[in-house]
Swiss-Prot record:
EC number: 3.5.99.6
This protein's encoding gene: nagB
Record's protein name: Glucosamine-6-phosphate deaminase
This protein's record includes keyword Methyltransferase: no
Coiled coil residues, start to end: none
Similarity remark: Belongs to the glucosamine/galactosamine-6-phosphate isomerase family. NagB subfamily.
Protein's job: Catalyzes the reversible isomerization-deamination of glucosamine 6-phosphate (GlcN6P) to form fructose 6-phosphate (Fru6P) and ammonium ion.
Any one GO molecular-function label of the UniProt entry: identical protein binding
Alphabetic keyword roster: Carbohydrate metabolism, Hydrolase
Source organism per UniProt: Staphylococcus epidermidis (strain ATCC 35984 / DSM 28319 / BCRC 17069 / CCUG 31568 / BM 3577 / RP62A)
Amino acid sequence: MKMINLDSKKLASFYVACELFKQIQQYPHTKLGLATGGTMTDVYHYLVNLLTKNKADVSQVETFNLDEYVGLKASHQQSYHTYMNKVLFEQYPHFAKNHIHIPDGYSENLEAEAERYNKLLDERGPIDIQILGIGENGHIGFNEPGTDFNSETHVVNLTESTIKANSRYFDNEADVPRQAVSMGLASILKAKRIILLAFGPKKKEAISKLLNEQVTEDVPATILHTHPNVEVYVDDDAAPDCL
């Protein structure tokens, strides 16, 4: 696992955007695993700028999102479908729609949807670069503490800490969905390369645990120690004291 400590969130985000852009330029059929949330917004901003400036061909690029809330239509303002459209797919509208994959959290049969997405990942993968955030409790994707390391795409119950952390995106905490469809930990580890980002003082403890804990289901992110190609980008506020 390689740690990269940069001065600011913007600088780290730019570096990661450059890595994604280089991958797209070198491998036109690349497969990207995408994440959402405040951590990722600047990454997509810089990636859109790079793609636009270079008039990049993304027609063969395929994207796979980590997760989606249960109970929200794709058109809902707080769905991850809407987020991805706002920050990337509408900003650079040259991705083929049939190459954009996001779980359907509004499916009538969530278990079947998880199975469908899992099959899609197996058939179209492996993902070349998977980007990840990390929760304050050490979750990646929506894989909360205690998640089986062998888990594949599944329906998860969100912890109270995750619900509280995500409530800032909703009118009130009661509106935050209590479940999500998420790639499992085993699914994430199938990616050829993983880039995790963490910014701000609230992520400092999670990064410290990632670095110092043994591999344990109590801190899902520690499973990344078993992967041969992981980079962790942090800003000064999230960097543990040992860095």
